[in-house]
Design a protein with these regions (language model features):
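A preference for well-ordered globular domain cores
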Residues: 1-90
Length: 90
């Protein structure tokens, strides 16, 4: 009898769509998107030109911390570490 072993599948990358990224801000999404603070606008503009958001990129945490420092009640680690849902994937 021949046994066949399959190599384990590599884990999926921690990538989500730009829309899913903004949706993770919850009820803070619209105030953040409307904010004219230069730090907040920097995150919005940077995210908006991307095909997807790589949640493993340390710059994502830095950007979220800038948004938080601008006065928005968000939890950067929760936004980054929440399990990725199938509909959030690019």
């Amino acid at each position: 009898m021949i046994e066949v072993f399959h190599a384990p599948q590599p884990p999926l990358p921690n990538h989500i769509t730009v829309g899913a990224f903004f949706d993770r801000f919850g009820d803070q999404k619209w105030p953040i998107l409307a904010d004219t603070n230069p730090s907040v606008q920097a995150l919005i503009k940077d995210a908006s030109v991307r095909a997807y958001i790589n949640l493993d990129d340390p710059q994502v945490l830095t950007g979220l911390q800038m948004v938080q420092s601008a006065g928005h009640d968000i939890d950067p680690p929760a936004i980054i570490n929440a399990p990725i849902q199938p509909e959030e994937r690019p």
